[in-house]
A protein has these predicted regions:
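Residues lining the SAM
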Residues: 96-99
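S-adenosyl-L-methionine-dependent methyltransferase catalytic module, highlighting the catalytic core
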Residues: 4, 78, 92, 103-114, ...
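Conserved N-terminal segment of class I S-adenosyl-L-methionine
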Residues: 1-88, 92-94, 106-109, 172-174, ...
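Short, charge-rich binding segments
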Residues: 85, 114-115
Length: 221
């Protein structure tokens, strides 16, 4: 058994990669590639050809992370200037907690679709409308806890957007990782015992902080 893969099933970003590709090699464009994302993904999917994209390189990555990347695209997505990203190339494009930082997220997602192969997958995750009603907490539990959040999106409207652009909606709704929900009391205890301050994302899944959308570009396109 691949222990890393089993444990990573708790992490929706990884779980949906596994649902999409399993053990097959794939080319991934990871939009929002900070926090050692390349290392985390390549440790579970060593045959992944990883491409990172972010506003700049200063989002908690090391030289080791960049060494694992086939390419890194440094750009402001809101400008919609994506000529340096190859068309019809990627098997997957992942946007995890990115679109809430973009005022024109729909246009960005439509501009990324030509980069995806026919039959390729896209996974989008972001704070949903419920996040505006949750209490404020260190590490973000309310949408406004992060001052760089600029806009709320909904999976209902995004579903329509992708359907209108010849894509199949494979999954949508409020993010609920039951592994994270089961692990929640143990995570809380671990933080208390270590003297660390509790962070908001411990409670995301039980409280329904985030929404997601999993789509496939029409294979016959």
């Amino acid at each position: 058994m691949n222990v890393r893969l089993f444990a990573s099933r708790f992490v929706p970003k990884i779980n949906f990669l596994n649902k999409s590709f399993g053990k097959k090699p794939f080319r991934l464009l990871d939009v929002g590639a900070g926090n050692h994302s390349a290392t985390k993904i390549k440790s579970v999917f060593p045959s992944c050809e990883y491409h990172g994209l972010d506003l700049n390189k200063d989002y908690n990555n090391s030289e080791e992370d960049f060494a694992l990347m086939h390419a890194f695209y440094e750009m402001d997505l809101t400008q919609l200037k994506m000529e340096t990203i190859p068309n019809n190339y990627f098997d997957g494009i992942w946007l995890v907690h990115v679109v809430e930082h973009l005022y024109n997220g729909e246009e960005v997602m439509k501009a990324l679709l030509p980069k995806l192969k026919p039959g390729g997958y896209m996974y989008i995750e972001y704070p949903g409308i419920k996040s505006t009603k949750l209490p404020s907490m260190y590490g973000s539990l309310n949408f406004k806890d992060d001052p760089t959040h600029v806009r709320i999106y909904s999976y209902q409207k995004l579903s329509n957007l992708f359907t209108e652009n010849n894509c199949l909606v494979l999954g949508k709704g409020v993010r609920r990782s039951f592994g994270f929900i089961i692990a929640m009391p143990f995570r809380i205890l671990a933080y208390w015992l270590s003297g660390k301050k509790l962070i908001g994302n411990i409670f995301w899944d039980i409280l329904g902080f985030a929404e997601y959308l999993w789509i496939q570009k029409n294979p016959n396109q």
